[in-house]
Structure formats: C-alpha cells, structure tokens
C-alpha cells in the first residue's frame, strides 16, 4: 500500500513521516522494477482491427484520429488511437510515436491512461486505450469559466502524484495542458497523450510542447530536465484557477514574458496559491520547486496543499468536486462531433523499417 508523505510538526509526526517516506520509496522501487521489466520487453501486436467495432471519432490530429470502439469479445469500450504511418514519417514523429507506445505499454498508475492493446497493419499504427467518458478538462473548464481553488487543488494533487511516479522512472511528460487531461466518470483525472513523453536520464534538447506551457529553458534552447513538467504544472494550476493561462504565446512579446518570468495574478488568488505559483513559475532552475534537493516534497508540503490527504487522493477516496454527466460506459456525449472518414488500408506494407519495433 502506498503512503505518500504528509508533513506533521510533532515528533510523532516526524516518525510517521519517516514511515510514509519509507513506504513511498518502497512503492516507487517496486514500480521501477515493474516498469523496467515491461520497458525492456515491450508487448507487440496484442490484437487486430477486426477485434473491434468502430463507433465514432472522438478527436483528430495531424497524423491520425482517436475513435470510440467496442471490443467484440468482451463488450468493453475503448479509445483507439489510429496513426497513419506515412504521415508520422512525413512529420518526423517516428521517434515520438515509438516512445509513446513503448512508454504506454510499460506504465501503470491510477492517474495515467492505460493502454490495453497495440498493433499495426499495412497503413496504420493502433493504440487501444481505456475510454474515459467524461471528456477533456479543457471543455469543462471553458464551460464553467474557472475552477475554485479546492477544485483546482483536487486535480493538481493527482498531477503531482502522476509526475512523481513518471519522474521516478526517468520519464518527462512534456505536454501538460487541459486538452490532455481526461475526467473519468468518478470525477478523477487521467493524463493522456504521451506523444512527447521521453525517457531521459540527465538532460534533453528537443523543442516540443504547447507554446503557452513551455518552460523558459525550452524556449531558450538550453538543455532541460524534469523541471519543465513542474513549470507546466504551475501554468496549469494558474489556468484552472483563473480560467486563462498566465502567458499567451501568440506573439514574440509574450514569449519574452515567459522568459522574463513576469506573472500577474488575478486579485481572487489566495496568498498561498500565489506563493506556490511563484515557486513553480520560477525561471531560475536552482530555485524552482520540484527541482530542489527535496524534490517533489517542496510541492507536497507547500501550504496551498496543506489540507490535501495525499494517500486518500492516490486511493481515490476523496469525493470529487465535479462529476461529468455520463449515461453509461459507451457514452461519448462529452466529446465533440467530428466528420467520419473511412479507414483506408493499403494492400502493401508502408514504412515497415521505421516501425519495426512498434
């Protein structure tokens, strides 16, 4: 059982602290073993297209689409990510796509979307993920306007735990934004879209991510590390609680703002929230929370999270502040409608070399 460390001031508290720190370490050590096993022996071709009925498109992207499908044998609903191999190659996303599949088949955490099957045919790559019927945080946030601080904190805590898990496996996520956060029928989060995730020991240099969420060190083409995810968490918490992001990266002047680290806070932000955000949206890496010698503990022990029971969040025992409207397991009404296109599968195999390991 995982006990996430919770600050206590008394001596009794500190011995409890040591216990939870120890069991956290134990949990993460075991998670590392499990991950390593799957990372080094990735599963391949665990299903085929004929195993599924395709129902409707849930989303589209530059080299594919995500469809709601029903597994014929089990009757379970899934979200099937379909990527056109030739488009992936053309857009130079081979490495990212192979990374995504390899990572998804190896990770296992309550707040990360789970991949159940993967396979390929002559034309496409397929990743079959659990279907999260509540839709994207993005659409709920835009509809509601902004989330209260307790509501924002509930989601932020899940992301902190998910990043703690990923970072302990040397994985950087690199694409945090409300569009990549799904809300399940119980009101808890699932992080999806591992297209930019990467296993990095030390530093990496790739320019990728979403402009508004890019850390200064990525924009400045410096080598960067996991600290970029903690910066993005700051941007996300700000956007959840304000209803708009701290930076709009549509003009060069806005990019300069990110690099300068100047952030204005709405007057309704609490002092605790402003303090946490100043420490996450910190341009100086030697001062950014999550990147200091105490690691994630600086974030988890911050007073804005003072009321958070990390263990209960991990166990999904806290009542969610908001439940999406869901009418059963295959209900896609929380997703937008898209034009449907027939799946074209070539008679000859495309890009077999590039995707041999998929």
Swiss-Prot record:
A Pfam family it matches: Pkinase
Residues at the catalytic site: 175
Activity regulation (record text): Binding of cAMP to kin-2 regulatory subunits induces dissociation of the heterotetramer. The released catalytic subunits are active and able to phosphorylate their substrates.
Signal peptide residues on this chain, from the entry's feature table: none
UniProt-listed Enzyme Commission number(s): 2.7.11.11
GO molecular function, one term: cAMP-dependent protein kinase activity
Organismal lineage: Eukaryota, Metazoa, Ecdysozoa, Nematoda, Chromadorea
CDD domains for the chain: STKc_PKA
Gene Ontology cellular component list: cAMP-dependent protein kinase complex; cytosol; nucleus
Nucleus as UniProt keyword: no
Location of the Protein kinase domain: 52-305
Family: Belongs to the protein kinase superfamily. Ser/Thr protein kinase family. cAMP subfamily.
Subunit architecture: Heterotetramer composed of two regulatory subunits and two catalytic subunits.
Compositional bias annotation for Basic and acidic residues: 8-19
InterPro entries, per database record: AGC-kinase_C, Kinase-like_dom_sf, Prot_kinase_dom, Protein_kinase_ATP_BS, Ser/Thr_kinase_AS, STKc_PKA
UniProt entry keywords in alphabetical sequence: ATP-binding, cAMP, Kinase, Nucleotide-binding, Serine/threonine-protein kinase, Transferase
Catalytic activity: L-seryl-[protein] + ATP = O-phospho-L-seryl-[protein] + ADP + H(+); L-threonyl-[protein] + ATP = O-phospho-L-threonyl-[protein] + ADP + H(+)
Region described as Disordered: 1-22
Enzyme class: transferase
Protein purpose: Essential for larval development. Controls the rhythmic contraction of enteric muscles probably by regulating G-protein coupled receptor aex-2-mediated calcium influx in GABAergic DVB neurons. Plays a role in the control of oocyte meiotic maturation by gonadal sheath cells. May play a role in the regulation of neuromuscular junctions.
Domain of life according to the entry: Eukaryota
Annotated protein name in UniProt: cAMP-dependent protein kinase catalytic subunit
Sequence positions that bind ATP: 58-66, 81
PROSITE patterns, alphabetized: PROTEIN_KINASE_ATP, PROTEIN_KINASE_DOM, PROTEIN_KINASE_ST
Organism of provenance: Caenorhabditis briggsae
Gene Ontology annotations of biological process type: signal transduction
């Amino acid at each position: 059982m995982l006990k996430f460390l919770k600050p206590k001031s008394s001596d009794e508290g500190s011995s409890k602290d040591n216990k939870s720190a120890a069991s956290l370490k134990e949990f993460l050590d075991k998670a590392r073993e499990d991950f390593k096993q799957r990372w080094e022996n990735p599963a391949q071709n665990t299903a085929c297209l004929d195993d599924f009925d395709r129902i409707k498109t849930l989303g589209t992207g530059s080299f594919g689409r995500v469809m709601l499908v029903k597994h014929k044998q089990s009757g379970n609903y899934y979200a099937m990510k379909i990527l056109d191999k030739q488009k992936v190659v053309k857009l130079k996303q081979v490495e990212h796509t192979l990374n995504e599949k390899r990572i998804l088949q190896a990770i296992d955490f309550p707040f990360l979307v789970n991949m159940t099957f993967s396979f390929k045919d002559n034309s496409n790559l397929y990743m079959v993920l659990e279907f999260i019927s509540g839709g994207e945080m993005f659409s709920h946030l835009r509809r509601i306007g902004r989330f209260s601080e307790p509501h924002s904190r509930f989601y932020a805590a899940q992301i902190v735990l998910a990043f703690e898990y990923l970072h302990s496996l040397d994985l950087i996520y690199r694409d945090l934004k409300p569009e990549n956060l799904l809300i399940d029928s119980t009101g808890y989060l699932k992080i999806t879209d591992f297209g930019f995730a990467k296993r990095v020991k030390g530093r990496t240099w790739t320019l990728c991510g979403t402009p508004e969420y890019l850390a200064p060190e990525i924009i400045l083409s410096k080598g960067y590390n996991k600290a970029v995810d903690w910066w993005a968490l700051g941007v996300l918490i700000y956007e959840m609680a304000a209803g708009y992001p701290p930076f709009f990266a549509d003009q060069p002047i806005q990019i300069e703002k990110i690099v300068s680290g100047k952030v204005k806070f709405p007057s309704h932000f609490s002092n605790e929230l402003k303090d946490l955000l100043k420490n996450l949206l910190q341009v100086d890496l030697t001062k950014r929370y999550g990147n200091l010698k105490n690691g994630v503990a600086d974030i988890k022990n911050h007073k804005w999270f003072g009321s958070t029971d990390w263990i209960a969040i991990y166990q999904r025992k806290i009542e969610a502040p908001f439940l999406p409207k869901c009418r059963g397991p295959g209900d896609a009404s929380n997703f937008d409608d898209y034009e449907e296109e027939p799946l074209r599968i070539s008679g000859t195999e495309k890009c077999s070399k590039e995707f041999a390991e998929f």
